[in-house]
Amino acid sequence: MANIKANEKSYRQNQKANLLTKGFKTSLKNQLKKTKASKDKKDVEQVYSLADKLAKNNRISKNKARRLKSRAARWSNSATAASR
């Protein structure tokens, strides 16, 4: 543990941020699984929204958000193409 007060505070802040980030990433992963299984347009929109929010707050990189959105769109498009 840190010996300096500022370092102790920094440690607490990092712990809190890590906990938040972990929760957000878990929710994104669960939404991706749901989208891949259902391939519903509403689920894809939720992936878009969640990925954009996380990228905006630097919880994930902007490139990762773009990649995830692209994958979700491909899953949705392949489902609509298969149903034709």
From Swiss-Prot:
The keyword S-adenosyl-L-methionine does not apply. It holds the Pfam family Ribosomal_S20p. Gene3D superfamilies: Ribosomal protein S20 (1.20.58.110). GO terms for biological process: translation. Residues 75-84 have a biased composition (Polar residues). SUPFAM superfamilies: Ribosomal protein S20 (SSF46992). GO terms for cellular component: ribonucleoprotein complex; ribosome. InterPro entries: Ribosomal_bS20, Ribosomal_bS20_sf. Residues 62-84 are annotated as: Disordered. Keywords: Ribonucleoprotein, Ribosomal protein, RNA-binding, rRNA-binding. Residues 62-72 have a biased composition (Basic residues). One of its GO terms (molecular function) is rRNA binding. Binds directly to 16S ribosomal RNA. Belongs to the bacterial ribosomal protein bS20 family. This is Small ribosomal subunit protein bS20.
